[in-house]
Amino acid sequence: MGKTLYQKLFDAHIVHEAPNETPLLYIDRHLVHEVTSPQAFDGLRAMGRKVRQPGKTFATMDHNVSTQTKDINASGEMARIQMQELIKNCAEFGVQLYDLNHPYQGIVHVIGPEQGMTLPGMTIVCGDSHTATHGAFGSLAFGIGTSEVEHVLATQTLKQGRAKTMKIEVTGDAAHGITAKDIVLAIIGKTGSAGGTGHVVEFCGKAIRALSMEGRMTLCNMAIEMGAKAGLVAPDETTFNYLKGRQFAPKDANWDAAVAYWSTLKSDDDAQFDTIVTLDAAQIAPQVTWGTNPGQVIAVNQEIPNPDSFSDPVERASAAKALAYMDLQPGIKLTDVKIDKVFIGSCTNSRIEDLRAAAEIAKGRKVAAGVQAIVVPGSGPVKTMAELEGLDKVFIEAGFEWRLPGCSMCLAMNNDRLNPGERCASTSNRNFEGRQGRAGRTHLVSPAMAAAAAVTGRFADVRELN
């Protein structure tokens, strides 16, 4: 029987496997940030251990950083301590750090692919749940806890059980204006926020192949939001063209050899998946979440569902609770719902194509009265490229705030957050209660939809603005 891409990647990295034992995998890349690493480095220090492979470990500051100043003190005492600890730990253990003043600094899941640290066929881990992003390159990438961070630092290995396999095929062509964010939200709307639990998901189909690498990263970034361990897209010419010439990508003859190997990284025709889900891309409209998990999502032109319409009692109770928290009524359209803030950024949607899509809507328009809208590029290079293209001027002239790179309002760990009761159109990945600030209300959308909400003051169908 043939193997799935996941099974090939897993088997290629087994260091040791014995009966009744969890396999030990080799880890090719370890990405580190300031929040989940301090205790891991302390553990190494306490045991007198070194980082096993410092050349395969890369660190950056992203979660806590201010997006308004490069001052390490700007986000508060705990943030300052965590960032200073990262500086100290990376210097002591010989780990490459992209600190606040480094031109490549940015969100860990943006800079990894951008610099070519992320390559097909790799195993990649990070103390962050959205490590699945890197699976867009055909790498097995997943988030780990702090104790596992320490284990990888010390041994460059990790014990991992085998996951079940899921194929999500998106057939046909997406309509104009439909993005990877809309596709993945529609997928999660179909599977539910726990539909992928215990699985590694492979995304495939004509609509997936048509996505750019940045679109595929958005897709895999949110695999975790359906409960999956990781998300994968098999590498192809789109992948190779994106990677060629990047800092850590192979060069010259090594490049040719790498591409020859990478081209083998795909599921066999006779591979068996445990679960198969199919969607028609032509049926997908711009998506907006209405509840408090990414699976509570509808097309922008649909009505908010009545909790009584859910046959499952758990879903019914969850919907009722979500509507109460979000202060929404069933039967109304999201296009009638006003917003207070707009956030364009995060490891889901802060790359150059995302900013271009938002700027296209913002150009020649103004942010609605009473709305605060911020645009946070995902890295220094993204910010530089956007400014070279004049996107910063488009946003600023429209009334958006143009910020420095960082995780920003995706999570309430820095100064960018919602006040209680504020409603936000956000390009991030989680709409949980309090995710963007205590009692804040988060609606997940694409960058273009976020820009449309900013200039209209409410959720708007971006297809009507183009």
Curated annotation (Swiss-Prot):
GO biological process: L-leucine biosynthetic process
Disulfide bridge positions per record: none
Molecular function GO labels: 3-isopropylmalate dehydratase activity; 4 iron, 4 sulfur cluster binding; metal ion binding
Pfam families: Aconitase
Keywords: 4Fe-4S, Amino-acid biosynthesis, Branched-chain amino acid biosynthesis, Iron, Iron-sulfur, Leucine biosynthesis, Lyase, Metal-binding
EC number(s) on file: 4.2.1.33
Functional pathway: Amino-acid biosynthesis; L-leucine biosynthesis; L-leucine from 3-methyl-2-oxobutanoate: step 2/4
Known catalytic reactions: (2R,3S)-3-isopropylmalate = (2S)-2-isopropylmalate
Family statement: Belongs to the aconitase/IPM isomerase family. LeuC type 1 subfamily.
Role summary: Catalyzes the isomerization between 2-isopropylmalate and 3-isopropylmalate, via the formation of 2-isopropylmaleate.
Name the record gives this protein: 3-isopropylmalate dehydratase large subunit
Organism placement in taxonomy: Bacteria, Pseudomonadati, Pseudomonadota, Gammaproteobacteria, Enterobacterales
